[in-house]
Amino acid sequence: YILEESYLFLDWYLAANKLITQKGHLKKNLKKIIDNLYLNLKIKHKVFVHRDFHVSNMMFYKNKIALIDSQDAVLGNPAYDLASLIDDVRIKTSNSFKSNILKVFLSKFNYKNESQFINDFEILSVLRNLKIIGIFTRLAKRDKKRKYLKLIPYAWKLIDNRIKLNPNFHDLKNFLQKNPRIKKI
């Protein structure tokens, strides 16, 4: 699911960027980079993944947190929903707050290999935010819902924050440095 959904970035955002679409090989290169990121996911066991796990889909019910909007749930990587929650484009939080949530989560769930979990968390956050940029571009272009465009700069900021240090993002970092981001969709 995440790999195919990441291609929404290619199909909509890159298509809106005339400079890149004039050079078809750039789309192929970015697809290969996305595919390689997906292949670098380390955790192979699957768990329930809500896929739309964010504060707006949580509510208190009988003194417990309940989730709504789970019709698109799948079996997938255990880091996906946490990446959705921590790097949600609709809610701006500090990097220290994000880091603290991740630390608390890891302390509660006792993963055997925390570095594998963090690796997957970062990759899934980036892939998910690329997907979101693609979806928001599609909403603007196809459905004339332009209100989501204002969230794209923060999605880029979330991506930039995640790709800084992880060596898995070397090729993506180079691609993004060499190719301009769309200023207006």
Where are these regions (language model features)?
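Hydrophobic HxD+1 residue recognition
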Residues: 53
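Active-site activation/catalytic loop segments of kinase-like enzymes and analogous catalytic loops
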Residues: 7-17, 78-112, 126-143, 155-162
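Short alpha-helical "patches" and their helix-cap loops
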Residues: 23-28, 56, 99-103, 144-158
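Acidic, serine/threonine- and proline-rich low-complexity regulatory regions
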Residues: 112-122
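Conserved protein kinase catalytic core
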Residues: 58, 75-77
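ATP/Mg2+ or Mg2+-diphosphate-binding catalytic cores
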Residues: 134-185
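ATP-dependent phospho-/nucleotidyl transfer catalytic cores
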Residues: 1-50, 59-61, 66, 123, ...
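Activation of the activation-loop gatekeeper triad in protein kinase-fold domains
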Residues: 69-73
